[in-house]
Each structure stands twice: as structure tokens, then as C-alpha cells.
Amino acid sequence: MLDTVAVAAEDPHHDQPWADLGLKADEYARIREILGRRPTSSELAMYSVMWSEHCSYKSSKVHLKQFSELAEVLAQRQPDAGRLLAGIGENAGVVDIGQGYAVTFKVESHNHPSYVEPYQGAATGVGGIVRDILAMGARPVAVMDPLRFGPLDADDTHRVLPGIVAGVGGYGNCLGLPNIGGEAVFDATYLGNPLVNALCVGVLRHEDLHLAKASGVGNQVILYGARTGGDGIGGVSVLASETFDADGPAKRPSVQVGDPFMEKLLIECTLEIFAAGLVAGIQDLGGAGLSCATSELASAGDGGMHVELDRVPLRDSTLAPEEILMSESQERMMAVVEPDDVAAFLAICAKWDVEAVVVGEVTDTGRLQIDWHGERVVDVPPRSVAHDGPTYHRPFARPAWQDDLQADAAESLPRPGSGDELRKTLLTLVASPNLCDKSWITDQYDRYVRGNTVLAQPSDSGMVRVDEETDLGVALATDCNGRFALLDPYAGAQLALAEAYRNVATGGATPLAISDCLNFGSPEDPAVMWQFAEACRGLKDGCLELGIPVTGGNVSLYNQTGETAILPTPVVAVLGVIEDVTRRTPSAWSTGGERVFLLGETREELSGSEWAHVVHGHLGGLPPQLDLEAERTLAELLHDAVGLVSSAHDLSDGGLAQALVEGALRHGVGVSVEVPDDAFVGLFSESPGRVVVTVPDGAAERLVELAERHGVELTALGVTGGDALVVEGQFEIPLDELRDAWTTTLPAALG
């Protein structure tokens, strides 16, 4: 028997599986209070997915509101800047980059589905973020993929990593979108909890911006794209709202299945619809599917919405109404269209062989009403589903073990003394999973499709040309060191921000805005919530000091197996603009005879470093000290040095040694340097705010003058050339030996 609104009113005591759907007793009681009756099974399905952790941000939104406040403060401080065209609350942030162009970008997570089904979980993660960008009115132009895995030698890493990489590459390659950057980091805490964060960037003209709202009584609601099936019912909303025990997830809904060729048609179809001016409002169908799209569109509009659910095209005719509402089948969009434009809209869809059906209309009732074969199965206030879910002020407290962790500094660990020991240490580090060559991964991605990629892996940032006539472009970088964030989550978030900011600046771009993906353990653990709260506070304070807004992002909680949470991993993506991509600064030198300099100050900062991790298996102490004002000054210097320096490469994981290795191996041109003072500290410290640059021999004096003018410390290191990495007075490593150590780790482990 169909559970209609009338039946629900007549049978108030009907037993309902609210707990199995992830709702708590007080949440279920609140739903009954809102409706004045028990919910129908369809309404219960909608509330359960929309009030899930993944969709409602119920544990995190009390901390996230400071990012909205940050945008207001920056707007008051810089009233003429006007860079942010759309921010938090939309599908993705939109930033003005000049010349009438805007860029929209966002990073999201698809962590839990990628553990259950690595290929499809990762592939649909890419597909979902691409549709978010498309829904803003933009053409997607590139993707990136910050990834985290368990130990490289673990069986489960061998299960998930190849599938995740193939999923990211397969979907992006089929869409014709270049993958221009990302990360692949290995740590024991990610075993059983891999992180698949996906970023997409899109380009639009200012006048093409579209928002998710259902306005205009009588306007038609059109569902178009792929048919709705049983895949992904409760997918991310269920999976991302629980921890995994040793046996895997207790609730195991099917992971969404992606079809990139359908998505490619959907992109081109949607862009033509935008160009024809046929859309009053639009929303992609991602997490929570139709439940999300209908409730968010209706609550963001000025009235209500009526939907005839039996009109939805199905792949599986046996699906019940609640299953249709919960399905997370991919490659679907929902548009609000004026009645006179419906025929033209449907004609464009037919041209692209995209199925489209009018499923409802905008009303003035203030209610979201959904019928199934003429019987009402949903009648709710849309805001109560989409926006007025529970808000938890979860307890948080600095863990008792934090003091002991910070007291256990790596600076006291045994360190190499002789040149031979330094040589051996360097070779060990460059062959370690986090520092080794990642070509095994990145070679599965097309980095240059579309022909506008300017920089891609292994450069510090990805860069794409936006306008082929003016050469206007944008740069993007994603970063996070989870070990630093464990030692001090406030500082760790700021260090992630600073590194991504610096990586954008090394290419010659000016940082403008950020998106974030905050990956943490269970919010029910006060220690994890303290990490989360501190990371949010650090990110807000850092952005305030750098003068750049948070445009939006994503929170992924419950990344934890039993009592073991992942390292706190606040991934930060920074977007920058460059006026002329032909003048970008590459990350590595390509000729001999160039002078090598270090910008920034090196301090003895080894806690949380790759050296401590790889050589000693140690994690403790305080992370490196950060000076955000110095980071901003360094970025300004790098901008002024465009055309003067021939390469610029930031120092981060692995310190100066790693930067020299990557610079020398990129084009097979060696380097000879003299490291002042303590060679070990000079090579392996991970002090932030540093960049290695090269300049033609005759330009060194100009660089010295520029550094003095900006007040940035400058150290002469040596000269490029030869076929070895030479540290004067310490050791020499032929490039062939260095390359063997750097490039063989992943192929040997993964085949």
C-alpha cells in the first residue's frame, strides 16, 4: 500500500525505520513536529538524506559560518576589489578575473564511496564536481585530484589505489578535461580511509552566471540527462555519515555508477541551453539526488514546487517513490524554465540525444509537493528539508595527549653527520612514497587535452589559458600536510594555505581566493572536533591576513576506522590569476650556467618533516613557524620577478634537497650548490616561505636588488649544469643514480 500524506495523517503510530536511515530519535521527533504528523516513507527518505552529515553539515556549520563572516570583512576592507561574484551557499564560488571573465572552482570529497568501490567512487567524484561547476553557467576546463592512501606496501592500498587513479583518469579523460595537478600522499591513518578529493575549475563570462533557485510561478521544472536507477541510493549521504568498522561499512548502499560520455553530452547540451537564455534556475543532481535538487531549488526560490514523480524516466521500473527520491544516479540536472521556452529547451536536449521531461512546476504554495500517480506522497516546507536541519554544537576539547605529542620534538633525533650519511639520507628520502616520482599516477591522466594547459604536474601549480587572444590565465594549487595538522591543527591549516598560495605565486600568478575540503575523523570524538574547530579558525585567520576569501568547499567527517582517525587533512585549493600565461615562470631550470638562489629564511625545523617520518618513523613536536606577512611579501616579489627569474620552485615536503632533486631531474640538467652553515638542516628543514629560483648569470644583481627592495632574505646557492647533483664539500650524486632512486618506487610497488 502506498504511504501517502493522507495515510500518514490517519495512521500516526505506524512504525518507521528512521534509525536505519541514520536519523536520531530527536531528529525524527523534530520532523513530526514540523509536519504536524508522522512523515510518509517518501518524506522520511528525503529528510534522512538531507539531514545527513554529508548534506546538512549539522556538526560543522557552526564552525563554517566564520568563512561567510570573513567574506563580509574582506568586502568592507576592500570595497573596490569586488572579486567574489558568488560565494558560500552556491554550487561553487565564482571569482572575477578581469576582461569580463569569471572563474568558478570548488574542491569536494568522495572518500567513502571510493573505499567501497574505488573506480566508480572516484569517477563519480569527478563527475559530481564537474556538474557543480557546470551548474554555475561555466564551461569546465580542468580538474585536479588531491589523494590520500594508506601505506604503499599495504594490501588494501593495492586494492584501492589503482581503481581510484583509473576512475579519476578514465572519467576526466573521457570528458576531455585536463588533469593539471593534485597530490598523492601515503600514511598509515588513511588505511581503510582513502581520501579522494576532486577539484574542477570552469570559465564563464560575467553575464553567463546562473544560480540555483526556482523563481516564477508557473515556470516548468525539467529533469534532463541520464535515467534514474537504483545505483547510489543513500550513497554519499549514508556512507559519508558513518565510520567504518573492521568489517567495512554497516550500511552498504550501492555506489553510484558513472557514464562520462553521457556527462559530456550533458555539458554541451547545458552550455547551449545557457547560450540560448532558456534557464531561470538550475541545479545538478549529486548527493541526495532528487531530494536535494527539488528542496534546494524550491527553498531558494520565491514560492513552492509541485512535482509528478511518476514522470521521472527510470532505468528500473520497480523503484518505489522513496527510492527514486534517494537515488544518486549520475549525469542528471534539473532546470527551471519559463513555459514559452520549454519547447526550445526540449529541442536542444533532443539535438544532443539527452532525455528531458517536464516533471513539475513552480507554485505559490510555499510547499514542496510531490505526487506519485496522482496521490500525494510528499507535502513539506522545502526549507525544512534543505536548510533547517539540525545544528549540533558538538563538544570539543584539546586532547590530553597533545602536550606530550608536541613535547616530543624531532630536532633531538639522531641525524646524519658525514657527507656519505647525508648522501644516503637524500637517496632514501627521494625514494620514499611521499617524495618519489608520481608519474605512475599522473601518466594515466591527459594533462594537455583542449590545448590550453600551460603548466601541469609536476609543476608547483596547474595553469590554464582562459583567453587565447589576450593570454589571460588562471593557476591552481592544492596542498595539505596532515602531519603538521596533527601537531597543531590551527598552524597546520595555515601551513596548507601558505603552501598552496606560494605554489600559485611561483608560477607568476596572483592568488585571489580559496576553496577547501576539510577531511577529519568522527565528530562524535571531542578531540577530532577540536582539530576541526582549530583548523577552521586557522584557515579563517590566515585568509584574513592574506586578504583572500573562502569561496566555498566541502566537509568530510567520519574518516575513521574504529578508534583510529585519519590525520586531520584540511586540503586547501588556491586560485590565482595571471595576465599573460606566455610569461609564466616554470618550476625547473632547463639550461646550465644559471645562478641558483634561495629566497626566504631557513630555520632548524624538522618536526613533522619527511626526514623524521621516513628515517625515524617519528611524528611529534611543533610544526614549522609560519609568517603570513612574509608569505605575502614573497608572493609580491615573485610577481615582480616574472621575466627575470628563469624558474621558481617552492620548498615544502623534503626541504631544499627535494627541490634540487626535482629541479635537476625535470630536464636532466644538474646543479652544484654550497649549503651554508649546517648542511643537514639546510637540506632537510621544512621551513615555509622559501623558494628556489634560477636566473641567467647576468641577471643576478637585479634579483639581489629586488630581494632587498622587498626585504626578503636571499642566499646564493650555486649554479646549474653538469650531470650530477653536487653539494660542495659533502657529496655528489650522478643524475642517473638519482633518477633510479626517484622513479622506481611506485612502479615496483604497483606494477
Curated annotation (Swiss-Prot):
Enzyme class: ligase
Metal-binding among keywords: yes
EC number annotated for this UniProt entry: 6.3.5.3
Coiled-coil regions listed: none
Keywords (A to Z) from UniProt: ATP-binding, Cytoplasm, Ligase, Magnesium, Metal-binding, Nucleotide-binding, Purine biosynthesis
Positions with a binding annotation for substrate: 109-112, 131, 256, 328-330, 556
Pfam families membership: AIRS, AIRS_C, FGAR-AT_linker
Principal location class: cytoplasm
Keyword Nucleotide-binding found: yes
Residues annotated as catalytic: 54, 110 (proton acceptor)
Pathway stated in the Swiss-Prot or TrEMBL entry: Purine metabolism; IMP biosynthesis via de novo pathway; 5-amino-1-(5-phospho-D-ribosyl)imidazole from N(2)-formyl-N(1)-(5-phospho-D-ribosyl)glycinamide: step 1/2
InterPro entries cross-referenced by the UniProt entry: PRibForGlyAmidine_synth_PurL, PurL_linker, PurM-like_C_dom, PurM-like_C_sf, PurM-like_N, PurM-like_N_sf
Cellular component terms (Gene Ontology): cytoplasm
GO biological process entries: 'de novo' IMP biosynthetic process
Binding, ATP: 57, 106, 516, 553
Residues the entry annotates as binding Mg(2+) 1: 108, 554
Listed GO MF terms: ATP binding; magnesium ion binding; phosphoribosylformylglycinamidine synthase activity
The reaction(s) this protein catalyses: N(2)-formyl-N(1)-(5-phospho-beta-D-ribosyl)glycinamide + L-glutamine + ATP + H2O = 2-formamido-N(1)-(5-O-phospho-beta-D-ribosyl)acetamidine + L-glutamate + ADP + phosphate + H(+)
SUPFAM superfamilies in the cross-refs: PurM C-terminal domain-like, PurM N-terminal domain-like
Compartment(s) where it occurs, according to its Swiss-Prot or TrEMBL record: Cytoplasm
Record: residues binding Mg(2+) 2: 132, 284
Function summary: Part of the phosphoribosylformylglycinamidine synthase complex involved in the purines biosynthetic pathway. Catalyzes the ATP-dependent conversion of formylglycinamide ribonucleotide (FGAR) and glutamine to yield formylglycinamidine ribonucleotide (FGAM) and glutamate. The FGAM synthase complex is composed of three subunits. PurQ produces an ammonia molecule by converting glutamine to glutamate. PurL transfers the ammonia molecule to FGAR to form FGAM in an ATP-dependent manner.
SUBUNIT field: Monomer. Part of the FGAM synthase complex composed of 1 PurL, 1 PurQ and 2 PurS subunits.
Recorded family membership: Belongs to the FGAMS family.
Name this polypeptide is given: Phosphoribosylformylglycinamidine synthase subunit PurL
Organism whose genome encodes this protein: Nocardioides sp. (strain ATCC BAA-499 / JS614)
Lineage: Bacteria, Bacillati, Actinomycetota, Actinomycetes, Propionibacteriales
